[in-house]
Design a protein with these regions (language model features):
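Solvent-exposed interaction patches of small proteins and small membrane subunits
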Residues: 1-131
Length: 131
């Protein structure tokens, strides 16, 4: 991934984080009034992060991982991102699958509680990759 593309994708993640921050600290009822918007922001955060990680793995000669989850974990193993962040982001991959594929009924209380960790983890991703 070229440095320009990486910067552009990290900038997109920063913009999505700004959008998500508007919902930080809202009540559950307020969340439910905007849950489709928040779901989409979370989906975009996860997909952009996955795209970055897949490209960075590929640039290191790694075969494409079969899942988003495994791509985040492999990035941690290779030192592309910290182990802590790789574990946290791997959990977000499961959330993405639920949102996109509706494998399970969405538990909105879990989604609501995921806002602070998403803000923390994707901010950390920018900090670790924007070197």
């Amino acid at each position: 991934m070229s440095p320009d593309v990486l910067k552009r994708k990290l900038s997109a993640i920063a913009n999505y984080l700004q959008d998500l921050r508007r919902h930080e600290g809202i009540t559950f009822d307020e969340f439910m009034a905007h849950h489709y918007e928040i779901e989409r922001i979370l989906e975009l955060l996860i997909m952009n992060a996955s795209d970055i990680i897949m490209h960075l793995l590929s640039s290191k000669g790694e075969a494409p991982p079969s899942t988003y989850r495994s791509s985040f974990l492999r990035a941690g193993e290779l030192g592309i991102i910290s182990i802590e962040l790789s574990r946290n982001l791997s959990l977000s991959a499961g959330l993405r699958n639920i949102l996109v594929h509706e494998y399970e009924e969405i538990d909105y209380s879990v989604l609501y509680r995921s806002i602070p960790s998403a803000l923390r983890d994707f901010t950390m991703l920018i900090a670790e990759l924007d070197k």
